[in-house]
Amino acid sequence: MFLTSILYTIIIILIFYKGLEYLIEKRSFPLVHPIKGVMNGTKPYFIFGDLPFQRLLNLKPKLKELGSIYFRWFFWYPIVEIKDINAIQYVYNEKSNNYSLYWNLNKSSNFILTGSEIKRFFRIYYCAFNCKDSLQRIMPVIKSQVFDFIHSHKFQNSTLSTNDDVTNFMLKLLSRVYLGSSDEAYHCFKANYKKFNKSYLDFFHYLFPTLLKIPSKFSRKYIKNKNKRALYQVLAMKAYYGVVKQSSDDHIEESMINIIAETSYNDKEGLSLEEIKMPSYLLNASSIKGPMIMVENLMFQLIEKSEIESKIRKEIKLVFEKNGKDVNSFDFDDIMEMKYLEATLDEINRLYPPFPKLMPRQTKESDRILGYHIPKGTMISCPVADILRDPSNFQDPLTFKPERQLIFSNPKFASPSITSIQEINGLSSSSSNSFALHHRSLPSINNNNNNNNNNNNNNNNNNNNNNNNNSNNNSINGNNKNNNRNCIQSFNNSALKKSFLSDSSSIIDNIVGTNRVDKLKLDSLNENSNINNNNNKDLLNVPNIIEINKNNPISNNKYNSYNNLTIEERNQRIIKNLPWGIGSKKCLGKELAKLIVKTIIVILYSQYTFDKHLDENDEELCDTNNQPKIQITFNPEIKPPLLLKSRKLFSISQPKQ
């Protein structure tokens, strides 16, 4: 009887599984290629989501066998994942209007903004997080927090756990950097950290939100943290109204929320009070968990790779000696000179990306990607971790090698930086009259070749008329000389800019063949270009107008530039920055997060060494395949201001004052 029951149970499970396979096949039928057929997909049991199977049962789909595009499941919804770099650029390109952000698990204010609102938010928050002025202002705050940690009782006890002590240290540091030094700031930040560090119990309550109405321990804790997260509204309001000092005695502490408020105040449009109270742009998963993950993984790898630790110490020592600095006096410019440390962080992000997938996009209309039909409403994602560990992209991808990242130290792989919000506003405030003088000649460029003769006659007549107006134009140019110079750097009218770029790009394509990503590159239009058509001599004047777009920090992607890169170079750069996202929606806090981690590493590793601290039950935690849940011992023999060249520690002389 017992065996019969087991047999019936097995039969029922098999029938259910086969029925599930049939339903999945029917659900994924539209994802079809005209030759290859239906798209590859993960196994049916992943219809319940990857979370329980990967974490609880340690089961993972064999993604390498699925190709460059495949579908996997989040409950009943198929999510198409793409690993081809060109397809990723196509979907996640900021100019793509068919693929909008979609994330139903997070009803964030980020996703209800559209059009010019997104550009305005992006401009202000980008400047606050990435301007050199902002980073220089916030760096002393980071240094003071690290020194406080070194002098604390926890640090002096020598043995620290990354799960407890290092995490608490990072919470205090990040709350001070982002929100300020008040207790409200710390409690608000910690509550947001818990929001993005959810457990299975949180996930279960997300699936069944009515459970929160039951007076349980979890629901009470949830409501308490929710109220603490609401403190952000108060902190943002204080920052918003505190930009203008009421008296000379007022002191505004350096924090990112105050810098954002100041940047908004100095911006040409700025943010309203309700907009600056939106927490999603400042307190999100990447800004909160990103630096923590980077620090823990880097400390773990440096313990495992003593030769890399020695190279970092050597670079710190060389930069300090070169610039006459020490651990107390180094500044932002000194850190920017540490290229090997930069490469080490990039390699950490490649091997252990803070987030394994990019934020999904949703198709507004049906499309084809890599030949497969993608129906309207399909969610598309990018498996970052799988791409960054793909042998076709990196040789020996599972090995930690910072040297492989040094190729990206070439300036062409780096986005040009901006100094302050005034630079963007200044470049966009040029004279509209001076731009119009350049733009009036554009219609003659955009005419078809069949009408060139008629246009030449018309242009001659126009030139005669223009000669009569030369004196007026010269007077305008003379009076607005400085404005015209600014005009060569920025378009004032975005509508005219778009119409010119769209029209002129097609003309340039017809004349000059190129495999460059940016069709408007200057080297194809200079005097050495082989343009033999006499009717197109006016194109030699175009570079001055194109220079407007090239030097504009917004239109020329001071945020996200692929200008003058080949397709291969562009793909290399996409892979390099993939841990932080791609396109206009990539993580804005990348440079700030890296500055925080660099400062921590420079201060700690210029004075201390790290060793494993193993208990009898801790050996399995030191497996390099696991997350760095290890304990770290700060060597008590090292005293500041020593600089460690290798594990054989010795003192070095202080820099001369």
From Swiss-Prot:
Its EC number is 1.14.-.-. The keyword Transferase does not apply. Heme binds at C587. GO terms for molecular function: heme binding; iron ion binding; monooxygenase activity; oxidoreductase activity, acting on paired donors, with incorporation or reduction of molecular oxygen. Pfam families: p450 (PF00067). Residues 446-486 have a biased composition (Low complexity). It is found in: Membrane. InterPro entries: Cyt_P450, Cyt_P450_CS, Cyt_P450_E_grp-I, Cyt_P450_sf, Insect_CytP450_Detox. Belongs to the cytochrome P450 family. This is Probable cytochrome P450 556A1.
